[in-house]
Structure formats: structure tokens, C-alpha cells
Amino acid sequence: LVAGYTGPGGKTILPGKAVAKLDLRLVPNQTRAEAEKKLRAHLDKHGFTDVEVNVSGGYDPTEVAEDSRLVRSELATYKKLGVTTSLNPRMAGSWPGSTFTSPPVSIPAAHFGIGHGSGAHAPDEYFLIDSTNPKVAGLVDATMGFAEFLYVLAAIK
């Protein structure tokens, strides 16, 4: 939220405008367009009809059935590589998966991979290139994991 004087020191002036940047997260069965309409309706209901809303991006939700060939192949690959798994049906992050899962393409899409990294999109983001711990995968192991996944995917009907 930015409003009023933002330079050095302080000034007691009334702001001519205020700007708020929002990051909306969707709940199951909600679309980006629906979230935008609900935001507009909420502002209007509370007397803020003069507030301008500029949408700068966003994606519809992505969901893939647990029993889909894609997810079964991912789980089989993890098992073959000796990786303990857990399914996370909803992520806090965003990605344009709906480009693939919605018409006209309508194919399953999901996140997958082995390897260790953290801090996605942060200044301290990292991915382990070479691991000295046999229980922690580095870049080579991650790459081979993707190759193994393709073989498993081809074998599963």
C-alpha cells in the first residue's frame, strides 16, 4: 500500500492518491475472473465505486486427478528412485498450469521432480548442484529423475 509523501523525512500532507497491490489466492472451484468480479463487488458494496482495479495477470486454478496417468507415473518414479512422497493438492504458489489443463488442450499437468532447493523467486533462491549426501539429490540426479519419469510414463497405460 502506497499513499502520500514517500520521500525522505516526514510531511503532513493529504495524499492525492493511494495504490494497493494485491495478490489474490483462489479457493477450489473459483476462477480468476470470478475473483476479480468479487473484488469489484466488495469495493462497490462498501462505497468505493471510485477505486480503479487494474488486473496485471493471473491464472485459473489447476487440478489433476490423483489417479491420472501423470500422477501415477510421478508416484511410480518416486517409488522406483526410493523417494518418500506426499501429495500436496493445493500450493500457495502460482503457475500457468490451467493453460494445459483447461480447454482446448485439457491434459493433466502437475509439479514433479527430485532434487534439493529452496527460496523460489527470493534473493537467496538456490538449487543443489552436486550433493555429497547420498540421500539428497543434486542437479544430475534431478535430471536423471526426469528421464526415468519419461520411461515410467511411457510404460503406464
Region annotations inferred by a language model:
Residues 11-36:
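C-terminal catalytic subdomain
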Residues 23-28, 52-67, 90-92, 96:
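A short beta-alpha structural unit
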Residues 35-44:
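Short amphipathic alpha-helices in soluble, non-transmembrane regions
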